A protein has these predicted regions:
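A short, N-terminal amphipathic alpha-helix
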Residues: 80-99
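Short hydrophobic beta-strand that contains or immediately precedes a catalytic carboxylate
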Residues: 43-45
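Short, glycine-rich nucleotide/cofactor-binding loops
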Residues: 73-81, 176-183
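Short acidic, Gly/Ser-rich segments with clustered Asp/Glu that frequently serve as metal-coordination loops
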Residues: 47-55
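Short catalytic/ligand-binding loop motif for oxyanion handling, primarily in non-cytosolic enzymes
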Residues: 52, 109-112
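Active-site-adjacent betaalpha module
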Residues: 1-41, 55-62, 91-96, 107-108, ...
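A solvent-exposed, charged loop/short amphipathic helix patch at secondary-structure junctions
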Residues: 55-75
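A basic- and aromatic-enriched beta-loop-alpha substructure that forms the phosphate/nucleotide-
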Residues: 101, 105
Length: 246
């Protein structure tokens, strides 16, 4: 089972360890203690057509900027790691009653004026408005009945969206994260979720960025205290254990 650097590195005095990662009874080495799928959401960050399609505008923009190797790394990461692990994680989450959330970078404004300035040209060039094919979830994750969907105007899944309200209304206090890219939109989603008080997990092998070094750095930063670092297999096992206990 994967362990977070913060827990494994002995950062915490013993009297503080019970409050790490916003988990009331956190214990190092027991990542899934008191885990409840019914109070959990799986937030899929930017797993949408314009972001990860090999022929899509985001990959094209990375290549046009002179970084074909970074585009190739992300595509290979998706094909070899993210995609296969999502095939394990998503069905297990839906069976266990985990609420699947699609957090999608797209516009609801005719001139894309709702998008943060730094990202606006990319979203506009992609034609990523809410309802467009570009802004729809990729086929690998689907959009099943019962899934939630939020449209974000910037990097994080919480900023400018109703996500916090929707989760709290359902009594959800725990979040699993998957998506792209780990150093940007995923990282900022996790950071915001931590400050909102959610217990959090980064499903590391369901995330990807533009280089192996970037992925390593993101996992180290996130794992320090924002979220526990786990694998898809870890999460599936925890969900199945809870389902069988019912």
């Amino acid at each position: 089972m994967a362990t977070s650097p913060g827990a494994a590195g002995g950062m915490l005095p013993p009297d503080l360890s019970a409050h790490w990662y916003n988990a009331d009874d956190f214990a190092p080495g027991e990542s899934w203690r008191a885990f409840d799928p019914a109070r959990t959401a799986l937030v899929l960050v930017d797993l949408i057509n314009w972001q990860v399609d090999p022929a899509g505008p985001s990959i094209a923009a990375i290549r046009a900027a002179g970084h074909p190797e970074r585009a190739d790394h992300l595509l290979a990461r998706f094909a070899d790691t993210i995609g296969p692990n999502l095939e394990l994680l998503l069905p297990a989450a839906r069976r266990a009653g985990v609420r699947v959330v699609h957090a999608r970078l797209a516009s609801r404004h005719p001139d894309y004026g709702d998008i943060v300035p730094a990202l606006r040209p990319y979203v506009q060039a992609a034609g990523a408005y809410d309802g467009s094919l570009a802004a729809m979830p990729i086929a690998e994750v689907g959009d099943e009945p019962g899934d939630l969907s939020v449209v974000k105007s910037g990097s994080g899944a919480f900023g400018g969206t109703e996500l916090d309200f929707l989760l709290r209304r359902e009594g959800i206090d725990t979040i699993l994260y998957a998506g792209v890219v780990t150093t940007a939109c995923v990282l900022l989603s996790v950071a915001a979720g931590f400050d909102l008080g959610y217990r959090q997990y980064l499903v590391a092998d369901c995330t990807g960025t533009l280089s192996a070094r970037d992925q390593e750095d993101a996992e180290r930063l996130i794992g320090n205290y924002l979220a526990e670092i786990v694998t898809a297999a870890d999460a599936v096992a925890a969900m199945e254990q809870q389902t069988h206990a019912l």
